[in-house]
Amino acid sequence: VTGTSIAMILGLPLGRIIGLHMGWNMAFFCVGIIAFITTAYLIFVFPKVPGGESFSIKQMPEIFKNKTLMGIFLVTFLFATSYYTGYSYIEPFLQKVAGLSDNWVTTTLTIFGAAGLLGSFLFSHYYDKNKYLFVKLVMISVAAALLLLYPISKAHMAVVLLCAFWGMAVMAFNVTFQSEIITYAPAAASSVAMAIYSGIYNLGIGSGTWIGGSICTHLSISYIGIAGGMIAVVAALLCIFVVIKYMKEFDRAA
């Protein structure tokens, strides 16, 4: 779970570094090489994992009748949409709006990715102590980071620190909600529920990128954080006042 989240966050700064120094064709070539190595590792090295409980299509209603899972799916879609409304265009935002140099843009994106490790650390140390409070703080943090992106963009060090805070919050969200999927899905359906979660997250990536692109085209790139933040506020309110209530009901019944 953490590995997937780190890969998603570190991909942009690493790709930018390769692209700036070796050309963007080489960046895509490196992606292909890494994919080939990963595939070879899975085929020839990775141990075979015994199959778990079988799951049939007739059991799908169990997932869709699960209020907690449905709430998590919806919050995830809104989160991914809000996140990628801003993150998809963060590089030109840092250049054109924040006025950072190329080196500082690369440094900021690297810090963004590295801060994700802190988000994973916070999850491992504090989630089990009070998971409901942890989830609330994560949702509020993501919304706050997006909403503050434009207002503090002219203060260079402040925007760098905000991006670090944002990266930490995003990682904390990813590991938290993937963990929740495993917790609240039926045992036989956990892999299917996780696959649905991944599909919904990717749908959010697409919708967020489209919304951010539309804002850049018809308004200004300055407003991508505000737009993403407004969506994140909706996600936070839904999570805090609806989904957490379902989580508590499920936990009491378990």
Per-segment meaning from a language model:
Residues L69-T110, A114:
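Extracytoplasmic gate region of multi-pass secondary transporters
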Residues L20-G32, S214-V233:
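A membrane-interface helix-boundary motif in multi-pass transporters
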Residues V45-I72:
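Juxtamembrane intracellular "pre-TM" segments in multi-pass secondary transporters
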Residues Y132-F177:
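C-terminal transmembrane helical hairpin of 12-TM major facilitator-type secondary transporters
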Residues V1-F46, Y89, F93:
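Helix-loop-helix hairpin linking two adjacent transmembrane segments in secondary transporters
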Residues G119-K131, C216:
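Helix-to-loop junctions at the C-terminal end of transmembrane segments
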Residues G3-L12, T38, F112, Y197-I205, ...:
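Structural signature of transmembrane alpha-helices in multi-pass secondary transporters
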Residues T183-I221, G228:
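A late C-terminal transmembrane helix in Major Facilitator Superfamily
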